[in-house]
Swiss-Prot record:
GTP 2 binds at residues 203-210, 250-254, 314-317. The gene is der. This is GTPase Der. Associates with the 50S ribosomal subunit. It comes from Campylobacter lari (strain RM2100 / D67 / ATCC BAA-1060). PROSITE patterns: G_ENGA (PS51712).
Length: 461
């Protein structure tokens, strides 16, 4: 697919134009210079033609971090087909802007000079100052007021192939409704794309999430720096691994409460958004620095969203911890609510054991989407209740008529009972353990609900 890159100095409106063309808020926008530090990508439709739109980090050399951002942006421009070079029409052009623009022209690609923030006649007069850039394709636009954008898109359309969007290309996100048929005793399972796995990368600031993403995709996709909070936007990247598409979302670092301000607060919300759209969470911990309460709170996000979970001990090569003791601490103490999660030690910077993590993602996804045959499930429940009978409810007999798995990702099991409210949480935990012993649900939450026969009302646990 052909690509269009938005490039220019910080705070010229690249992310605002990106959001406008994407028709939704994806990139974080702010008056603070340098808000976008990574490249965001999304498929868009330009005059009925498919294109990959890329929002790059600002071109700036004021410090080491922004030099890295600039290098990433220039690399993305070299791999793009069309360049929108954006400038701020509220200011007169400077030599730095001109130098960056000429650097883009050397790539010999279709390039447009896009002068943003042209909101009135006075701004339009000022835009003539950019004529010395020596480019034919100049577009005065105002993203805020949606002026001039159609003309820009029509120009770009001339360089795009006639590859029209099909309705089948758009994913169907219709809400799923659980249907229980009393007569058949069957539930309607949601459809899962078994060849596309969505993975969220979570963890507190500077534990190595961006380095891990780069190691996983073998490309410097996210800007990596020792400066805490380098990544602001969630950065999506997809790879193929053993014939499966794995889509990663590198979420913004999560700061301690009380220190979250402005962009960080919005980025924290974006972390929640990323997990809402993920199936598996990689909980990244800093093995060299050790673990703290904030790690536990972040882990709770994965539990809250009922995702598959893999605990990743990053920087293990710099750690002096004993693996068995660390595993015991994680499973029995700090993260006992994620006792089902496998623990993988890696070094993101060196790439050591990253291949093990990729294989584990496939395994956990298979567990996340597996369906237990109803006959086998009922045989297991019958044996479990015989070995450990259900407690009576104030002298009344409590009975499970049958069990059925009614959903995937995560797996959910319904127990059809005469007195569903009488099922104690400890007995649910007992049944969960029995199911895990017989079926491989490593890395996956297992949800059990109790329902009265002939009713959709449930008691979940």
């Amino acid at each position: 697919m052909q690509s269009i890159i938005l490039i220019g100095k910080p705070n010229v409106g690249k992310s605002s134009l990106f959001n406008r063309l994407a028709r939704k808020r994806i990139a974080i926008t702010s008056d603070i210079s340098g808000t976008t530090r990574d490249t965001n990508k999304i498929e868009v439709q330009i005059d009925g033609k498919k294109a990959l739109l890329i929002d790059s980090g600002g071109l700036d050399e004021s410090n080491e971090l922004f030099k890295n951002v600039k290098a990433n942006s220039l690399k993305a421009a070299k791999n793009s087909d069309i360049i929108f070079y954006m400038v701020d029409g509220k200011f007169l052009p400077d030599d730095e802007d001109k130098a960056f623009f000429y650097e883009m022209k050397k790539l010999n690609k279709p390039i447009a000079l896009v002068i943003n923030k042209i909101d009135n006649k006075k701004d339009e007069e000022r835009s003539w100052e950019f004529s010395n850039f020596g480019v034919k394709e100049v577009f005065n636009i105002s993203v805020t007021h949606n002026i001039g954008i159609d003309e820009l898109c029509m120009w770009a359309s001339k360089f795009l192939n006639e590859n029209f969007l099909d309705a089948d290309d758009e994913e169907d996100f219709e809400s799923y409704l659980e249907n229980f048929d009393e007569n058949s005793g069957d539930f309607k399972l949601k459809t899962i794309n078994e060849n596309h796995i969505k993975v969220g990368i979570i963890g507190r600031v500077n534990v190595g999430k961006s380095s891990l993403l780069n190691a996983l995709v073998k490309e410097e996709r996210s800007v990596v720096s020792d400066i805490a909070g380098t990544t602001i936007d969630p950065v999506n990247e997809s790879i193929m691994h053993k014939d499966k598409i794995i889509e990663f979302v590198d979420t913004a670092g999560i700061r301690k409460r009380g220190k979250i301000q402005g962009l960080e607060r919005y980025a924290l919300n974006r972390t929640e958004y990323a997990l809402t759209n993920a199936q598996i969470a990689l909980l990244v911990l800093d093995a060299a620095e050790g673990f703290n309460e904030l790690d536990e709170r972040i882990a709770g996000l994965a539990a809250k969203h009922c995702l598959g979970v893999i605990i990743v001990l990053n920087k293990w090569d710099k750690s002096e911890l004993d693996f068995d003791k660390t595993l015991k601490e994680l499973k029995l103490d700090r993260f006992k609510f994620l006792a089902y999660a496998p623990v993988i030690s890696v070094s993101a910077l060196s790439g050591k054991r990253v291949h093990v993590l990729l294989d584990k993602i496939l395994e956990v996804f298979a567990n996340f989407t597996q369906k237990i045959p109803t006959a086998k499930l009922n045989a297991l429940v019958e044996e479990a209740t015989r070995a450990h009978p259900l407690p009576h409810d104030y002298g009344k007999l409590v009975k499970i008529y049958y069990a059925v798995q009614y959903d995937l990702a995560p797996p959910k099991i319904a127990l059809i009972m005469n007195r569903p409210k009488a099922l104690h949480f400890s007995y649910k935990r007992y049944l969960q353990n029995q199911i895990r012993k017989q079926f491989n649900f490593e890395g996956v939450p297992l949800i059990i609900v109790s329902r009265k026969k002939g009713s959709k009302d449930e008691q979940e646990g």
